[in-house]
A protein has these predicted regions:
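N-terminal, charge-rich interaction modules
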Residues: 1-57
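Residue-level signal for the start and early helices of compact helical domains
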Residues: 3, 44, 68, 73, ...
Length: 138
């Protein structure tokens, strides 16, 4: 039996990180170095599924109609279509260039079906839990 391999739509979704940001060009350059086109996501697209925003074939467009205020969630970088080596390269490039984006995620078979707003909320919960555990251990 042959495994069905879904085509990958490489991209870097960027939430709440304006192109006027001083390190925007460094972000774009780092993504281009590993073959990822940068796709800024507007607050009116927060109800669309992550898969649809990435251009994954067969992904449903929107699960909810939603318009988020940019201050609802901090900046996020959501990556699709990278192997481990390219992911490590990208993260090192971002660190070297001084690009700081608080939330980062890789698209998975599960989260590609979520609305962007749900993924952002989950990333914030995870970040808060990590901070809580770190504070508890100090």
């Amino acid at each position: 039996m042959k495994a069905r391999i879904r085509p990958v739509a490489p991209c870097a979704l960027v939430w709440n990180y304006p192109q006027t940001e001083p390190s925007w060009s460094a972000l774009v350059a780092a993504c281009e170095k590993v073959g990822l086109p940068v796709k800024p996501v507007s607050n009116t697209q927060a109800g669309h599924t992550v898969g649809w925003l990435c251009g994954i074939p067969g992904a449903s467009e929107a699960s909810v109609l939603l318009h988020l205020a940019p201050e609802t969630y901090p900046a996020a970088l959501i990556l699709n279509g990278l192997d481990r080596k390219h992911l490590d390269t990208l993260l090192a490039e971002l660190r070297t260039a001084g690009v700081t984006i608080p939330l980062k995620a890789v698209v998975t078979a599960t989260n590609q079906q979520w609305p962007l707003s749900e993924l952002l909320a989950e990333l914030c919960r995870e970040r808060d839990e990590i901070a809580r555990r770190a504070a508890k251990n100090t």
